Each structure stands twice: as C-alpha cells, then as structure tokens.
Amino acid sequence: MIIRTTVKSIQDIMRQDVGVDGDAQRISQLTWMFFLKIIDDQDHELELTKDGYRSPIPKAFQWRNWAADPEGITGEPLLNFINDELFPALKELKLTGKPGDRRRVVRDVFEDAYNYMKSGHLIRQVLNKINEIDFNNLDERRHFGEFYEQLLNDLQSAGNAGEYYTPRAVTSFMADRIDPHPGEILFDPACGTGGFITCAIRHMEKNYVRTPKQREKMHDALRAVEKKPLPHMLCVTNMLLHGIEDPSFVRHGNTLARPLISWCKDERVDIVLTNPPFGGREEDGIENNFPTFRTKETADLFLALIVRLLKPDGRAAVVLPDGSLFGEGIKTRLKEHLMEECNLHTIVRLPNSVFRPYASIGTNLLFFEKGAPTKDVWFYEHRVPVGQKAYSMTKPIRLEHFHDCMAWWGGKERKGRKETAHAWLVTADEIKARGYNLDIKNPHTIADDHGDPETLLADLVAAEAETVGLRDQLKAILSEALAR
C-alpha cells in the first residue's frame, strides 16, 4: 500500500534524527505534522464549499505557505521557524468565542505538543513525504485512516500506552451492543485516542446516517475528554480523519477534577462508552470531589461519575479490571450503589491476554442502564478460540471472536437468553449475600483432570531416574572421548 510505504519512509527518516527517542516521541512528532496537513487540506475544501470561510490558522503558519513547497525553507531556518515562530503562534491562538471555533482545536492540540526533531534538513524530507498524501482524496484518506489505526496499535510498545489503548475488536463489540443513534448524547470521559468514539461513528454511519442532517445531528451529540497530551492530539487527528470538521468536542482536561455534585441535569448523557485507565491513581485532592466514594483509584472514581452522568434510561458499556469486581471497602459501596441506581444486566468476562503485551490482567465489560435497580446479572465468559493458547500481538482478538456472544445476546431486548457452557445467571440477592463480590466464576467449567496423584508421582520418579541414567551415559561417552 502506497500510504503504508510513505509513512514507513517518514519513520525511517525520523530515526536518523538525534532528537527523536523512541516510539512515543516519533508518533507524537508524526501526529502534529499530519494534523497541520489534514487541517490545511480541509481548509482548501471548505474555502470552496463555504462562503466566507477562513482558516483557523494565521496565513504565515498555514501548511501551504511554509511546508508544501518541496524546494522551500529547509535546514536551520526551517528549524528556527518551527521552534521560534510556528509553535508559539499556535499555542497562543486567540479564540473568536463563536460556536465551532476551529482555533480552539488547534490551540488545544499544540498546548503540549513539542518538536523533537533537531535537523531542519530531515524535517524538510519528512514534510515532502507528507505532501504525497492528499487528505481530500477519500480513497487515500480511508487508507490512511486504516494505517493510522495500526499506528495507534503500535503504541502498545510505547511504554504506558495501555492507559489509552483498547483493542479495536473490544470497542467495536461494545459500540454494537450499545447501539447509539444520531442525536443521542454519547460521552467518553477518558477517551484516549478516540477508539470508542470512532467505532460509534462507524456504527451510526453504517446503520442510521443517511442524510447530511443526520450526520450533523450525530456530530453535535459527541462528547469526549482526555487528560494526557499525546492521546488527546491523536484523538483529535483521528476525528479529523473521520470527516469531523470541528472536533472541539474532544476536550483536553481531567473529567474527575470537578466535584461529583457539580454535574447538573443539563449535562447528563444518553450513552457512556469508556475504558478508564487500569490501576491509575489520581493526584492528591481529586478524591475530595467524591466524598461518598473517597479513593484515589481512577477506575472507581470514573464508575461513580458514570452513574451520576447517565440520564434516566441512559446506558453504558465500561471496561473494568477484575480488581473492581472483587475489591472490598469503597469498591463494595460503589458496586452496591451501581446496582441500586442501574440495571447491571450483563458482564462479559475477558481472558487475561486481551490487553497484552502491556497488561496481562483479567478484564470485564460491564453493560448497565440507569433507572431500575438490578434484579439479576447475566455473566458471559469469552474464551480464547480453540487451538489458540492466548491472544497476542500476532494473534489479537478480533470482532468475529465475539460472534457467539452476539448470537446469544438476544437482540435489543435481550430476549431468549439461556444458560450455556459460556453463560450463567446470578440474582441480585445472591450477589448481595456475597458482599457484592462480582468476581463470579463460570459454574459450568469442568476442572481439568490431571490424573491420580500417586500415579503422577510414580511417573515423575521414573522420569527422573531415566534422566539420571541418560546423564551418566553421556558422562561416560565424553570421558571415553577425552581419554583418546
């Protein structure tokens, strides 16, 4: 694929630059450059289709005026321009205060962006390669979008990237089960690189969006927040690639920084799709925003917030680690609160290998609806396909691996569910009697028969004796050979 080859060439050029150290910096560098090219290509189109349209970026800093000419500025002058003029200008863009102000998007992206490259000549080579991609060409944009997702997957090897990466198959499955419609307010309070939002967009485009009005309705109802600079920048760029003209709904900030009670009725949402960071701990003082559930554990605080944010009949799908299911103390109170305020109708239990290589931890997909309390909970155990020991980088989880669960689900009304080798039902009373411990194992699993212990011990002794005999034979052969 030409796009893949182009981006690989760019990465190879960056590896020659002494200032770029590792995957995370390389991807960050790539992203702000692609962002400016995508914005400029969109500007070209909007200038033709919208009367009076003006780019959010001042003329001197528009891609077309400093980066597009292959024979343009290079070397030390280019490096100085980027560091001393371009970045300061974009970090301090003045906002118009009008709705849909794309200047906010640009300023937020560059707020914590950084130019890692030290060679102006290598920067020029990268710019010229990027110019080979036309983001107004739908076919090229689609191919680049596919490659961009692979680029996000590459973040798995970039340190603590697991905090904001969820496998595409998992996000697609959750979006499909939640079934968002255009106009329903959909929120991801810890959006990372935007995987849940893009899967929700694809789901709505495939099933419901038929007119420009419906598309506008879908876009206007999206909400997202990301705390860290790199995933925020990646998310905004991801939205642009998905044809969203104004991704200012992706805010850069900490959703947990507000007191829980300050979220009022007009901020409630219809849908929450999210994967709060595993094992994250918030800074001092954040727990004071949650007086009833005072803890520094990020996943717990997000769960409390989600219950608060949902409208009556609102629905959520949330990824949580096993620790949230069996934990005690604050976690127990939180699960009791969840089951009193919401119908926790389904928990899909995933194997430890789904989030490898950066996390080997049991995870769960919780599906619940605000309103009626929980009467019973269906559990579904997702297993690694037969013939495969675990999911991995080379054999990751795919959407087709969820097809059995989707067939069992019972449609929108969840009708006709039956207990199977993978599925079992637990009443709310049973869960309450367990102290709200939701770490309930599959009762249909048959324990592996390892055989009679005495027979196994005898076999072990015989095997060890055979090993000793072989070792003695080898010693004798070696001694004889050395004596010659």
Regions found by a protein language model. Give the residues of each.
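Non-catalytic, mostly N-terminal accessory regions of nucleic-acid modification and defense proteins
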Residues: 1-182, 247-257, 349-354, 374-383, ...
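Switch/connector loops and helix/strand junctions flanking conserved nucleotide-binding motifs
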Residues: 258-261, 279-282, 326-329, 356-359, ...
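C-terminal, active-site-flanking charged/polar segments
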Residues: 343-344, 356-403
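Short, contiguous acidic/charged loop-to-helix segments that flank catalytic cores in large enzymes
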Residues: 17-21, 283-298, 322-330, 351-358, ...
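Conserved S-adenosyl-L-methionine
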Residues: 163-274, 279-281, 287-289, 296, ...
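Conserved Class I SAM-dependent methyltransferase catalytic core
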Residues: 26, 174, 229-232, 296-368
